């Protein structure tokens, strides 16, 4: 199964500049394509990729980051059309008729930056996120690196990461990092039975049928 973990990384001035630069280009590109879809009709991910992969903003985005943004935008439009269809059947579920996906804002509504597992490396306590050649040259770095504390290392398996997402908190005005990772799903012991008794003196009492195996 896949799980997610959200935390606020310790970001240096240079790292923040890189994140903001990536956010600027993915936000601008999102808006350009979204405007096109609003004016000229919806397109598939493959059509978007074919038409916009040569846009100059893409030079500053790793190919996997760019492609994930395209897929998110495509999904946003699919969700919109599904909502419009459902609105026609169940209008009372909605306060108003669904509207097309909104535009992003480089200051207040920054677009999410997504790195897939192909753009993520973890090496001896260091999380490395792949960057485009243009960003590497602009900031004189090989990758966007973050030290993972011992505490965080103990919480999840960093070698099983599937995605890393930078998400901007509009209220706190800071960046959070969301990592999505794989974890083996344990089989439930279907032969055992447990019950919870909410009490007055004790918060709760847990009772198991097969106590010796707990």
Question: Positions of the model-derived regions?
Answer:
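Nucleic-acid substrate recognition interfaces
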Residues: 1-214
């Amino acid at each position: 199964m896949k799980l997610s973990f959200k935390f606020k990384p310790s970001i240096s001035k240079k790292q923040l500049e890189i994140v903001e630069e990536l956010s600027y280009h993915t936000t601008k590109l999102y808006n350009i394509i979204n405007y096109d879809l609003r004016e000229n009709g919806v397109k598939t991910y493959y059509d978007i990729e074919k038409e916009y992969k040569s846009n100059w903003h893409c030079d500053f985005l790793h190919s996997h980051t760019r492609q994930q943004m395209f897929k998110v935008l495509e999904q946003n439009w699919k969700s919109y059309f599904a909502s419009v269809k459902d609105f026609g059947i169940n209008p009372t579920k909605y306060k108003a008729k669904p509207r097309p996906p909104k535009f992003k804002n480089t200051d207040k509504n920054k677009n999410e930056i997504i790195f897939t597992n192909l753009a993520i490396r973890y090496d001896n306590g260091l999380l490395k996120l792949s960057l485009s050649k243009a960003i590497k040259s602009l900031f004189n770095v090989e990758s966007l690196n973050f030290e993972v504390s011992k505490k965080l290392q103990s919480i999840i398996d960093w070698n099983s990461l599937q995605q890393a997402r930078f998400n901007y908190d509009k209220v706190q005005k800071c960046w959070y990092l969301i990592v999505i990772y794989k974890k083996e799903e344990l089989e439930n012991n279907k032969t055992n039975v447990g019950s919870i008794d909410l009490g007055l003196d004790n918060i709760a009492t847990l009772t198991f049928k097969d106590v010796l195996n707990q």
